[in-house]
Amino acid sequence: MDFPSRFEVIVIGGGHAGTEAALASARMGAKTLLLTHNVETLGAMSCNPAIGGIGKSHLVKEIDALGGAMAMATDLGGIQFRVLNSRKGPAVRATRAQADRILYKAAVREILENQPNLWIFQQAADDLIVEQEQVRGVVTQMGLRFFADSVVLTTGTFLGGLIHIGLQNFSGGRAGDPPSIALAHRLRELPLRVGRLKTGTPPRIDGKSVDFSVMTEQPGDTPIPVMSFMGNKEQHPRQVSCWITHTNARTHEIIAANLDRSPMYSAAGEIEGIGPRYCPSIEDKIHRFADKESHQVFIEPEGLTTHELYPNGISTSLPFDVQLQIVQSIRGMENAHIVRPGYAIEYDYFDPRDLKYSLETKVIGGLFFAGQINGTTGYEEAGAQGLLAGANAALRAKGKEAWCPRRDEAYIGVLVDDLITLGTQEPYRMFTSRAEYRLILREDNADLRLTEKGRELGLVDDARWAAFCKKRESIELEEQRLKSTWVRPGTQQGDAIAEKFGTPLTHEYNLLNLLSRPEIDYAGLVEVTGLGAEDPQVAEQVEIKTKYAGYIDRQQDEIARLRASEDTKLPVDIDYTNISGLSKEIQSKLGATRPETLGQASRIPGVTPAAISLLMIHLKKRGAGRQLEQSA
């Protein structure tokens, strides 16, 4: 039997975006080919050994709710789990896990290799086959031709990748891997806007040379959280601690004295790409925050079978001799041995405003982009885009309509809408602050928001669907039980509740009413009554929905009011220069972005509410005119 050459979907790249894209496409029944330059690096964590965090865990849980692999791999490879913002409201709580690089990568590869409809092949893609503004396939580095009408590009930092250490630079996709030069040249021939971005990574440290006794220990949470809705803590390997230390005045002096040897700050200006605002290099921190006497450094283990450590907070592209001085100036690392030097990497990205909501390019039919090629940073952002692009590539291959969640439905929707509407001039990172409807888009209810849609699309398997339906039913039953259970003052149970919570009952209440009070919690009610949900996820949902019901209802009302105009489609052939009343500037902005809906148009910087009103009037006139033409 020959190796097949025709597929429905081809995915280029085996990182976090590529693996989720390939899995999503294959889960939906599309014959899918995943091309990777090295099978051994499928699912590799190129930078920090962690998944989740503020805003990011929301994306991971949404990927999971849609059947993706990231959360499951994290549960299988996670060596420390914590809930961030645990004392704050549920909208901003976020799960974060340190991961063993080897275990995480192995989990991703096992999921890939056991996925039906998915072929994995080790070859770099050097060229795209494009005919009449439609992608038809790819050509690999050894001239093999694979054909598909949907191709997903998830190239990470490999497009024209250039690694910098001090004033020296060399080509690379990441340390130890070659860049994609031929494919970068091919993409620059397409009518797409292209730019350069930069990211960086710190030197890795040998843990045997570190004195942990002078650092602050940071253990994981107890009880241990899980990342996947299908996960359990028994899946976790051995749990370990992280450690915290700080830079100091000596560290800052070393950096300041050597800025002229930095590729970012030297007179030569070796790096032209813009780096991530929210994950700056240590030289950036010293330059931008000169008044700060120290910066935190989180010492994170790379895995259970290695002594290698990741010093989170000192990403740098300074020369190796300076890196060594920096590391050894930090408390606890005076005798530290560097295993791998830190570096910065520049790479090509393409303006995401040239994409549709489906992540398909506007100019080449069937060509989808996901991950860092769209200007984002982070495993979670990449995985979310990959899943969406892979799903839409499969939908297109089957002749079905594309799908993207709205801003009020998912952080994935916020991410995509921000990218294709606003574009980005620097690596884009997700935060909860980017979402208008944070209380509805919590990490804990991602499955309740998305799993039903995932099942409809073919992304969710039978086991996940059965577990979801059971959970949803259990929530409804528990709410009904609380609503129908009444407590009277003066009874044994009423007195027990009053004593437990310091809240005398003035009249008869049902348990749901009592739970809505800020001083009463679900666990306390269970303790007093002896009854409650066994599943902690069910208990959590019941408590959050009850306590925040008023706020949630207000957000839902606001969403309903805005939805009509939000979803109003703008014609593909609309000519903004013919709409009277629009300024030249706004005509230009609308023409450049080509928004798909009124809602997207309203979020373009500089497009005023008055301009949106003019667009609505134009659409009504256009609709009335077409009705007259049809009646004639």
UniProtKB/Swiss-Prot annotation:
Q: Which cofactor does it need?
A: FAD
Q: Which GO terms describe its biological process?
A: tRNA methylation; tRNA wobble uridine modification
Q: Which SMART domains match?
A: GIDA_assoc_3 (SM01228)
- Record's InterPro entries? FAD/NAD-bd_sf (IPR036188), GIDA_C_N (IPR049312), MnmG (IPR004416), MnmG-rel (IPR002218), MnmG-rel_CS (IPR020595), MnmG_C (IPR026904), MnmG_C_subdom (IPR047001), MnmG_C_subdom_sf (IPR044920)
Species assigned in the record: Pseudomonas fluorescens (strain Pf0-1)
- Encoding gene per record: mnmG
Cellular component GO terms held in the UniProt record = cytosol
Keywords carried by this UniProt record: Cytoplasm, FAD, Flavoprotein, NAD, tRNA processing
Q: What does this protein do?
A: NAD-binding protein involved in the addition of a carboxymethylaminomethyl (cmnm) group at the wobble position (U34) of certain tRNAs, forming tRNA-cmnm(5)s(2)U34.
Q: Which domain of life is it from?
A: Bacteria
Quaternary structure (record): Homodimer. Heterotetramer of two MnmE and two MnmG subunits.
Q: Note the PROSITE patterns from the entry.
A: GIDA_1, GIDA_2
- List localization entries: Cytoplasm
GO molecular-function terms, A-Z = flavin adenine dinucleotide binding
Task: Give the UniProt family note.
Answer: Belongs to the MnmG family.
Which positions does UniProt annotate for FAD binding? 13-18
Question: What is the protein name stated in its UniProt record?
Answer: tRNA uridine 5-carboxymethylaminomethyl modification enzyme MnmG
Q: Where does NAD(+) bind?
A: 275-289
